[in-house]
Amino acid sequence: MRAIAPRSIRGEFRGRLGGFALDAAFSVPATGITGLFGPSGCGKSTVLRCLAGLQRLPGGRCDVDGDVWQDEATFLKPHQRPIGYVFQEASLFQHLSVRANLLYGAPRGGADAAEGAVGFDEVIELLGLSHLLDRAPRNLSGGERQRVAIGRALLSQPKLLLMDEPLSALDRLTKDEILPFLERLHARLSLPVIYVSHDITEIERLADHLILMRAGKVLAAGPLTELQSDPALPLATARDAAVNVDAIAESYDSVYGLLTLRLDGGRLLVPSAPVQPGEARRIRIAAGDVSLAREAPHRTSILNILPARIATTSPVGPNEVLVVLALGPGGQGARLLARVTRRSWDQLQLAAGDELFAQIKGVALAPERGAARDSAS
């Protein structure tokens, strides 16, 4: 990270667009990647257009790092806003080479002119474009075209990068090829990003913060893990509910092929290729892969058993209970979810505040980092 991160991104957009009503207000840190997530047609792209100045709603407000882009007296037009915009499909100039497309939006004086600017060579390296510079867009694959579009947006030296479902037009294999490039940008650049998607797997891999939308409304905005573990929100009650946790690689056991990860509230063992100690890793733990025990189990095939406290609970239908766990002695660590039957809940006589043990049957690493699952055997 080379620059001091902007303080916040705030938006307030309300109004009717034909038969669609938008009621979106949010404030998120202007650092890292903020996912804008919800089902198709909920208003995600409309919010992005409002941030970009492509859609003007009376009474709207928008400021980034204290700079007002829209209020009662101000409305900056799109070309006046320091943004980069990446659309669902790359809009490249067909008569220009990849190099010329990349440099098209760069400020005069060269892409490296401004202090703290993202340099041309850096963008080429981050996005793996060096072998494509002399090609025409018609000779690129869909994934290559989108990487060029991202590079062009970065070289415009934006203060905020807006990405409107940039992978939605690509097949799953191509998506999996591009996601590591986006993660590399996230790790190396301080540029804040608003990333629109209706694909939760993209959000789980990329986002630090989340704006959750449904039917034109912002349901909540905040850190990804907080929204994932809030039983009042649909992410936590979904059948495939999971929580993402950022961890640090601590050691590697080459005999058993197991990586020890340190997270807030304990340590986990995960099958993995060798990695260097100190490397950051994002893991995903599904609610269905966590079971509960009153006492520490002995002689079990489950590798990961951590002390935890029940933070809160919520019924899920007539026969299940969603349990929000806080890891570590005293429950001061990371949050996880567990989904148990009401019979198990009653038999264990559980209640909020109880201390117990979380048996974690499955831990998934992000795919590009050597995806693996730690099974119960």
From Swiss-Prot:
Subunit structure: The complex is composed of two ATP-binding proteins (ModC), two transmembrane proteins (ModB) and a solute-binding protein (ModA).
MF annotations from Gene Ontology: ABC-type molybdate transporter activity; ATP binding; ATP hydrolysis activity
Binding residues for ATP: G38, P39, S40, G41, C42, G43, K44, S45
PANTHER family membership: ABC TRANSPORTER I FAMILY MEMBER 10, MOLYBDENUM IMPORT ATP-BINDING PROTEIN MODC 2
Keyword check for Cell inner membrane: yes
NCBIfam families given in the database record: modC_ABC (TIGR02142)
Sequence ranges assigned to domain Mop in this UniProt record: 299-369
Annotated membrane topology: Peripheral membrane protein
Protein's cellular compartments: Cell inner membrane
Keywords linked to the UniProt accession: ATP-binding, Cell inner membrane, Cell membrane, Membrane, Molybdenum, Nucleotide-binding, Translocase, Transport
Family: Belongs to the ABC transporter superfamily. Molybdate importer (TC 3.A.1.8) family.
Pfam families listed in its UniProt record: ABC_tran, TOBE
Gene3D superfamilies cross-referenced by the UniProt entry: 2.40.50.100, P-loop containing nucleotide triphosphate hydrolases (3.40.50.300)
Domain ABC transporter: 4-240
Name recorded for this polypeptide: Molybdenum import ATP-binding protein ModC
Described purpose of this protein according to its UniProt entry: Part of the ABC transporter complex ModABC involved in molybdenum import. Responsible for energy coupling to the transport system.
Enzyme class: translocase
Enzyme Commission number: 7.3.2.5
A GO-annotated cellular component: plasma membrane
Family annotation (InterPro entries): AAA+_ATPase (IPR003593), ABC_transporter-like_ATP-bd (IPR003439), ABC_transporter-like_CS (IPR017871), Mo/tungstate-bd_C_term_dom (IPR008995), ModC_ABC_ATP-bd (IPR011868), Molybdenum_import_ModC (IPR050334), Mop_domain (IPR004606), P-loop_NTPase (IPR027417)
Catalytic activity: molybdate(out) + ATP + H2O = molybdate(in) + ADP + phosphate + H(+)
